[in-house]
C-alpha cells in the first residue's frame, strides 16, 4: 500500500515540474537581439551575440559586425 501512495504523490507533484519545463520550450527558437534565435547552443556557422532567458544563447548566422 505504501509504494502505491508514493507513486500517487510522485504523479501529483510531477505536473508542476512539467509546467516549468514548458516555459523553457516557449523560449526556444524565439527571436532575440539583432534578429537572432534563442537556442541551447549556437551552431558552428553562427555567432553568440547575447543570452536569452534560462541561459539560452542568442545566435546570429554568419559573423555580424560588432
Swiss-Prot record:
One BP annotation, GO: defense response to bacterium
GO-annotated cellular components: extracellular region
Keywords (A to Z) from UniProt: Antibiotic, Antimicrobial, Defensin, Disulfide bond, Secreted, Signal
Main localization of the protein described in the UniProt heading: secreted
Compartments where located: Secreted
Signal sequence range: 1-19
Family annotation (InterPro entries): Beta_defensin_dom (IPR025933)
Disulphide bridges, residue numbers: 32-58, 38-52, 42-59
Function: Has antibacterial activity.
Protein family membership: Belongs to the beta-defensin family.
Protein name (Swiss-Prot/TrEMBL): Beta-defensin 134
